[in-house]
């Protein structure tokens, strides 16, 4: 039997004091491109494949990026009954989006083959985070495949502590960092940014991005060297040319009218004007060029060509108006925010609510306060933990006046929710300051761009209306870009059409003190430091304006509503924990059964009591106190008769603590028989008159 020989190619790069190792030729040899990437003991397999034929008639690039977390990579078992990985976790979905975003703009125009990139985490050392490695692995897999790709693209993480930037920090280092930044880009420019920050200023953020880019350049050069040695020749593909017949007809009959249509006021009116003109021109085009051809026999490629060129012309007209005339379709200047409105307490029962409207984008944000039982369980590769604050974002079809299926959230909804949650998380109080679990839901009731940023503004207002002591308000704004050659215009507060037809979506959120979240996606191959600086400065000015409106609406946390669960925390001595819990949990279960409250006890003696109202809270705290209190001399207690003797009665004055009420201490008058005046179960107040020898003596007559 012949021994199988692998033609494995390996290359290494020193990066942040560790070795980045890439290899191909050993695993997944039937993929068009396959890379095993290792950093420390974290290992990913990145594969790139394409369909055999181009997708005809596609008006989008059919790219799919998957990121698969395998629990065996960190020596763990999956949860659930089947003990098998199921649908991707929220984190896996977000990482897949993160890899997709810098890769997508790097394919040549007109390339319409289906492309599938899969990143599988094979080993995770809990030090080297696999997220950004997926960008590097995906890029290199494409570089060595036969798929046309304008890369390479690389990515790094940057932390910031004590005035120093940290390259590719560990999760532990990120916990202590003022910044959690992922940047991706080419050798020439940055093309993706994702960040959370502890109110960092714009200049420091920009320096962090450029620090990241310096290291990205090295990784891109490394990829180029590897792909030159081991890459395949790219396939040839034909970029479709616009038919002269279609182009000439639309330019002659529709150019000036389309210029007017795109300037129609209002999203719905503008869409109707553009669509009705397209229908009119299409009908005329068919009558002039295919007068005798039945509708069902019209050439599909001609109809598609017509629609494509019409859309491209609309895009060109909108972009030129902004770039050369600084004229936006809704009449705003390039730095102007759409009309704003903010209201709180718009719903009667929810603990906190707000309605934030910016132009034709609207978020109805609702805050709910709960107990530790309401915390969200997160089970990822590193560890299992609970989140006390989380935000959910919903984008129903009615928000854009359409029909559609209502179901579980998709990638876009998860991504927008994650960004809004991250922006607000930096102002959420600690558990010691505010022991509630906090859930914010953003219902997008109208949308014309920047709905994630409306969710941040609405969420902040809703939190404050619920009484959450957030440090200060957080506002978000989305910046856009129109760029042709060296000419460019940065837009403040982009609406849907500007996002769709523009080159950049740069979302910036923060307080008046600094940035808490940042996300940048572009449709071109990269943007310069100058563009980012202008965008950050314009975003800062816009954020201050929005924060002023929000603070005028509500500037400090409101009082908790009466229907909010009541929570109080007390600390008991560690040696009293067992007494409170009782044998087999008897005591704590008894308290819960009597009151209906929830009682949580930590190993360090922190007792958290969650009750439906103030009376229940007070009753529960008294019961807790009764189990941990010590009997004190001369104190009065409410006791219960547990047994009767000839010489007196034994009474329980605290759980598990009994004393003797002697017959002579029952009443000022003489008592002949104890049972004549007392019965088992009687409850009354007694005073501790002696504690000699560990024996407790009680008196009823001295109360």
Swiss-Prot record:
Belongs to the polyribonucleotide nucleotidyltransferase family. GO terms for biological process: mRNA catabolic process; RNA catabolic process; RNA processing. Involved in mRNA degradation. Catalyzes the phosphorolysis of single-stranded polyribonucleotides processively in the 3'- to 5'-direction. It is an enzyme of class 2 (transferase). SUPFAM superfamilies: Eukaryotic type KH-domain (KH-domain type I), Nucleic acid-binding proteins, Polynucleotide phosphorylase/guanosine pentaphosphate synthase (PNPase/GPSI), domain 3, Ribonuclease PH domain 2-like, Ribosomal protein S5 domain 2-like. The gene is pnp. HAMAP family: PNPase (MF_01595). One of its GO terms (molecular function) is 3'-5'-RNA exonuclease activity. PANTHER family: POLYRIBONUCLEOTIDE NUCLEOTIDYLTRANSFERASE, POLYRIBONUCLEOTIDE NUCLEOTIDYLTRANSFERASE 1, MITOCHONDRIAL. It holds the Pfam family S1. Signal peptide: none annotated. This is Polyribonucleotide nucleotidyltransferase. SMART domains: KH, S1. InterPro entries: ExoRNase_PH_dom1 (IPR001247), ExoRNase_PH_dom2 (IPR015847), ExoRNase_PH_dom2_sf (IPR036345), KH_dom (IPR004087), KH_dom_type_1 (IPR004088), KH_dom_type_1_sf (IPR036612), NA-bd_OB-fold (IPR012340), PNPase (IPR012162). Its EC number is 2.7.7.8. Its cofactor is Mg(2+). Residues 634-701 form the S1 motif domain. Keywords: Cytoplasm, Magnesium, Metal-binding, Nucleotidyltransferase, RNA-binding, Transferase. It catalyses: RNA(n+1) + phosphate = RNA(n) + a ribonucleoside 5'-diphosphate. CDD domains: KH-I_PNPase, RNase_PH_PNPase_1, RNase_PH_PNPase_2, S1_PNPase. Mg(2+) binds at residues 499, 505. It comes from Fusobacterium nucleatum subsp. nucleatum (strain ATCC 25586 / DSM 15643 / BCRC 10681 / CIP 101130 / JCM 8532 / KCTC 2640 / LMG 13131 / VPI 4355). GO terms for cellular component: cytosol. The lineage of its organism: Bacteria, Fusobacteriati, Fusobacteriota, Fusobacteriia, Fusobacteriales. It is found in: Cytoplasm. Residues 565-624 form the KH domain. It comes from the Bacteria.
């Amino acid at each position: 039997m012949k021994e199988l020989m692998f033609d494995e190619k390996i290359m290494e790069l020193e990066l942040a004091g560790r070795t980045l190792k890439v290899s191909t030729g050993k695993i997944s040899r039937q993929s068009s491109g396959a890379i095993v990437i290792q950093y420390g003991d974290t290992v990913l397999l990145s594969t790139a494949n394409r369909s055999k034929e181009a997708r005809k008639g596609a008006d989008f690039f059919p790219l799919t990026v998957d990121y698969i977390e395998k629990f065996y990579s960190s020596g763990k078992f999956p949860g659930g009954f089947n003990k098998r990985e199921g649908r991707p976790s929220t984190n896996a979905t977000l990482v897949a989006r993160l890899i997709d975003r810098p890769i997508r703009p790097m394919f040549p125009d007109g390339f319409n083959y289906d492309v599938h990139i899969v990143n599988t985490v094979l080993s995770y050392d809990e030090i080297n985070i696999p997220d950004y490695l997926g960008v590097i692995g995906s890029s290199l897999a494409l570089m060595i495949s036969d798929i046309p790709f304008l890369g390479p693209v690389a990515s790094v993480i940057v932390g910031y502590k004590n005035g120093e930037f940290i390259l590719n920090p560990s999760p532990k280092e990120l916990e202590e960092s003022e910044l959690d930044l992922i940047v991706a880009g080419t050798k020439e420019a940055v093309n993706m940014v994702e960040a959370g920050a502890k109110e960092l200023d714009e200049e420091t953020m920009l320096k962090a991005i450029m620090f990241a880019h310096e290291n990205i350049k090295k990784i891109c050069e490394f990829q180029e060297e590897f792909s030159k040695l081991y890459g395949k020749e790219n396939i040839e593909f034909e970029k479709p040319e616009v038919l002269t017949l279609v182009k000439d007809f639309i330019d002659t009959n529709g150019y000036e009218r389309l210029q007017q249509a795109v300037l129609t006021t209002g999203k719905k009116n503008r869409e109707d004007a553009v669509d009705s003109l397209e229908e009119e021109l299409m009908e005329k085009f068919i009558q002039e060029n295919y007068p005798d051809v039945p509708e069902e026999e019209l050439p599909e490629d001609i109809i598609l060509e017509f629609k494509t060129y019409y859309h491209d012309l609309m895009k060109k007209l909108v972009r030129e108006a902004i770039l050369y005339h600084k004229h936006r379709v809704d009449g705003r200047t390039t730095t102007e925010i759409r009309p704003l409105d903010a209201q709180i307490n718009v719903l009667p029962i929810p603990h906190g609510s707000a309605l934030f409207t910016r132009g034709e984008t609207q978020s109805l944000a609702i805050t709910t306060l709960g107990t530790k039982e309401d915390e969200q369980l997160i089970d990822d590769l590193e560890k299992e933990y609970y989140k006390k604050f989380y935000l959910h974002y919903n984008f129903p079809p009615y928000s854009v006046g359409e029909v559609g299926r209502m179901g579980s959230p998709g990638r876009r909804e998860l991504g927008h929710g994650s960004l809004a949650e991250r922006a607000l998380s930096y102002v959420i109080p600690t558990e010691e300051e505010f022991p509630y679990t906090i859930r914010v839901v953003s219902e997008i009731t109208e949308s014309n761009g920047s709905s994630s940023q409306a969710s941040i503004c609405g969420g902040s207002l809703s939190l404050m209306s619920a009484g959450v002591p957030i440090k200060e308000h957080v506002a978000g704004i989305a910046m856009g870009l129109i760029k042709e050659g060296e000419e460019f215009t940065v837009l403040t507060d982009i609406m849907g059409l500007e996002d769709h037809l523009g080159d950049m979506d740069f979302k910036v959120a923060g307080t008046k003190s600094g940035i808490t979240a940042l996300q940048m996606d572009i449709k071109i191959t990269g943007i310069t430091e100058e563009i980012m600086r202008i965008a950050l400065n314009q975003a800062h000015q816009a954020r201050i304006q929005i924060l002023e409106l929000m603070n005028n609406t509500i500037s400090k946390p409101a009082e908790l509503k009466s229907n909010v669960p009541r929570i109080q925390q007390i600390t008991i001595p560690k040696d009293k924990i067992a007494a409170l819990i009782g044998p087999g949990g008897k005591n704590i279960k008894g308290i819960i059964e009597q009151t209906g409250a929830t009682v949580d006890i930590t190993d360090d003696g922190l007792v958290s009591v969650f009750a439906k109202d103030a009376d229940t809270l007070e009753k529960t705290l008294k019961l807790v106190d009764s189990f941990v209190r010590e009997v004190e001399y001369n104190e009065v207690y409410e006791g219960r008769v547990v047994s009767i003797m000839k010489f007196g009665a034994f009474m329980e004055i605290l759980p598990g603590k009994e004393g003797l009420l002697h017959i002579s201490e029952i009443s000022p008058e003489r008592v002949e028989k104890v049972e004549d005046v007392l019965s088992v179960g009687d409850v009354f107040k007694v005073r501790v008159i002696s504690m000699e020898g560990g024996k407790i003596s009680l008196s009823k007559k001295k109360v």
